[in-house]
Amino acid sequence: MTLANIKSAKKRAVQSEKRRQHNASQRSMMRTFIKKVYAAIATGDKAASQTAFVEMQKVVDRMASKGLIHANKAANHKAKLVAQIKKLA
């Protein structure tokens, strides 16, 4: 239910809610991919970590290019995880 009275404002409210839900879904999916990399690192399996990282990198870069997250945040995620993967034997 919206507080808008004007037709265009009602439409914008509907569009905003739709967009908010889509963005929340995309953000959740991105976080899941990041968690998969952390889980792979925790097991100590370098090959699995690298595979998970490549998948995560694609998703994070796509979200950054679409403006869902800032490009620097994407870079921070990737740098932090690649450093941890390099520490694995």
UniProtKB/Swiss-Prot annotation:
GO terms for molecular function: small ribosomal subunit rRNA binding; structural constituent of ribosome. The keyword RNA-binding applies. GO terms for biological process: translation. Keywords: Ribonucleoprotein, Ribosomal protein, RNA-binding, rRNA-binding. The keyword Ribonucleoprotein applies. Residues 1-28 are annotated as: Disordered. InterPro entries: Ribosomal_bS20, Ribosomal_bS20_sf. Gene3D superfamilies: Ribosomal protein S20. Pfam families: Ribosomal_S20p. One of its GO terms (cellular component) is cytosol. Belongs to the bacterial ribosomal protein bS20 family. Binds directly to 16S ribosomal RNA. This is Small ribosomal subunit protein bS20. It comes from Haemophilus ducreyi (strain 35000HP / ATCC 700724). The lineage of its organism: Bacteria, Pseudomonadati, Pseudomonadota, Gammaproteobacteria, Pasteurellales. The gene is rpsT.
